[in-house]
């Protein structure tokens, strides 16, 4: 379960230039698409080339997860201080590493199921993004509740993995986490307007920050839908 939040943004009731806002939204979704495309290609190559075996047997899996987490932390904590080039490099580095870790999806689920549910996830994500974009209401108050639910979901998932080991609880958690990220997508899309009005953020890189947020939202929605409805390999 992955995401991070920056609630230090100004009230998005400020009137902004719609052409500028639309430009930022366009760049955001373009960068998000590039990240997802890169992750998908890397994931498929890692699995079908057999590289996944070398990674697991060689003990590199835990290292990749640590590096992946480190990149997210650096990205979120140092975003304001980093240059647009550095931010872009971190974003693509994360999407590439995440592509490697996502290769297990191909090992667990049938390809037809992966493709079809990816499309379903994309349609749901697009609808939620549209709602967040068109909503004029300030949704910044959602941030606290989202963080609480995400932390609770993470803790319960870890407890279920090592202690409870309940498939029933696992399914319930999948539904809860999915519901949370559906709300997160609306929240993050709406937050782009507020970020546009934050004078402390470089407009040359804010779209990359937003792309990372939405990338994480989509990946989590897709993984939850795949876990609930995906057809597993025999």
What does each of the following model-derived ranges do?
Residues 1-234:
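A hydrophobic alpha-helical transmembrane-helix feature that marks the membrane cores
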């Amino acid at each position: 379960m992955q995401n991070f939040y920056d609630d230090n943004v100004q009230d998005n009731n400020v009137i902004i230039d719609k052409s500028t806002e639309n430009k930022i939204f366009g760049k955001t979704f373009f960068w998000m698409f590039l990240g997802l495309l890169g992750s998908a290609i890397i994931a498929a190559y890692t699995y079908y080339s057999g590289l996944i075996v070398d990674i697991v047997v060689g003990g590199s899996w835990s290292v990749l997860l640590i590096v992946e987490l480190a990149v997210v932390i650096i990205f979120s904590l140092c975003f304001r201080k980093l240059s647009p080039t550095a931010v872009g490099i971190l974003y693509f580095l994360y999407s590439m590493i995440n592509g490697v870790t996502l290769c297990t999806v191909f090992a667990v689920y049938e390809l037809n199921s992966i493709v079809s549910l990816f499309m379903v996830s994309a349609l749901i994500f697009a609808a939620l993004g549209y709602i967040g974009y068109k909503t004029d209401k300030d949704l910044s108050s959602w941030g606290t509740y989202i963080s609480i639910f995400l932390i609770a979901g993470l803790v319960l998932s870890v407890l279920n993995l090592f202690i409870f080991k309940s498939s029933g609880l696992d399914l319930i958690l999948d539904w809860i986490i999915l519901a949370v990220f559906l709300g997160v997508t609306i929240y993050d899309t709406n937050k782009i307007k507020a970020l546009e009005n934050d004078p402390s953020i470089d407009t040359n890189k804010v779209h990359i920050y937003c792309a990372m947020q939405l990338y994480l939202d989509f990946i989590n929605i897709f993984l939850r839908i795949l876990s609930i409805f995906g057809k597993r390999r025999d």
